[in-house]
Amino acid sequence: MRDVYGVAAFRSRQQVLRFESVLRQRGVPTQVVTTPRDISMGCGLSVRFPMERLNDVRQTLMTSNPGNLIGLYRAEYDGTRLRVAPA
């Protein structure tokens, strides 16, 4: 089973929680998750979102200017391995 999703990684937990809240207010399904190991920096938490909503997430980043963003990533789990690449 293949699971593909987006990850927004930040340097601070406070920014993760703020950005997750803003996305939810805009109707984007989100979840606070442990940051994947391939994204080695940050606070250890990230915001998970559906890849279909990547454009909404990018637009929200531009308008909310959360700061401390490490990056947006595409994560794909194929049942045995998680692969992470810049989105």
Language model: regions and residue ranges:
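Amphipathic, hydrophobic secondary-structure cores in small proteins
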Residues: 4-63
